[in-house]
């Protein structure tokens, strides 16, 4: 088991790592729309937040030695399911291999963001 860390994605905001490598898989922690350069949430729309989340995930996966194209499963959390279609538009541009996915509504997400996504990917 190996911890993954990159300064190109936000630091964890709790007692967890950005990702863990186990065997031939990497498990990311949920990423929210924190800009790693500023350490704050700057995006306000579901589209812009999803874009930042996907960029953060790409950085973590790259640090682990893999890529978003090797994602096998994602779990997505939306604060409002009315954002589902707009979320999917941006998500689909990044996850072109269409990994297995669960998407659920969460009453409230950290820092009051609109979206959070975690990934399991093959190394």
PLM-predicted stretches and their roles:
Residues 1-123:
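Short, polar/acidic, helix-capping and beta-turn segments at strand->helix junctions
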């Amino acid at each position: 088991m190996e911890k993954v860390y990159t300064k190109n994605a936000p630091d964890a905001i709790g007692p967890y790592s950005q990702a863990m490598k186990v065997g031939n898989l990497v498990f990311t922690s949920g990423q929210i729309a924190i800009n790693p350069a500023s350490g704050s949430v700057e995006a306000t729309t579901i589209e812009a937040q999803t874009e930042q989340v996907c960029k953060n995930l790409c950085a973590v996966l790259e640090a682990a030695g893999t890529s978003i194209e090797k994602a096998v499963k994602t779990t997505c959390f939306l604060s409002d399911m009315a954002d589902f279609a707009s979320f999917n538009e941006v998500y689909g541009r990044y996850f072109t291999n269409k990994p297995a996915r669960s998407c659920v509504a969460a009453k409230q997400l950290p820092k009051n963001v609109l979206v959070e996504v975690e990934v399991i990917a093959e190394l």
